Amino acid sequence: MLLRGQNIVGYTNYADDVVEAFVAMSAKHGMNIFRIFDCVNDPRNMETSIRAAKKAGAQAHGTICYTTSPVHTTQTFVDMGRELADMGADAIVIKDMAGLIPPYVTQELVSALKKDLNIPVWIHTHDTAGLGASTYLSAIDAGVDACDVSISPFANGTGQPDCLRMLALLNG
C-alpha cells in the first residue's frame, strides 16, 4: 500500500492515533507492505506510519521522493535514507514520481545508499521522459535490490517501464 505518512491516503494530516488505527486495520485485512512517503521528504511525517507498520507485523518501506533543487543532493537523500532506516524501515525506496531521474544520477544515488545502509534499496520510476528502462539498468548495475515494473497494457508513458522490455534487456 502506498501510504502518505501522516496524510494516510489523503491530503490532510491526521492525528497519530488515526494513522496507527488505519495501518493496523489495513494490516489486519491483508496489507503486508507499506510504502511510506512524505511529499516534502520530511521523515518526521513518516515515523508514526513506520512504527505502526512494524507493530502490525508488516514491512515498512521508507520512501525518498526524488526531486531536484540545490538542496536535494545525493548526500541529503543518503542522510534521509539513514534516518528512515534508523526509524525501523525494512527497505528504502527511491520514488521518482515524475520519471525524471537520469541514469547517471541513479547510479550515484543507488551506489551511495547501498554503501551506507544495510537494508534493501528499491527504485520506482515512471517512463514519462523515456528514461525508465535506462534508469533501471543503471540502478541494477549499481546493485539495487528491486525495480517496480508494469505489464505492457499499463506500461511506459506515465506508467512504469514494461516488464517484458526489462526482461529482454536483462536477458541480453
Language-model segments: residues:
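Catalytic cores and adjacent flexible loops of soluble metabolic enzymes
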Residues: M1-R35, C39-G172
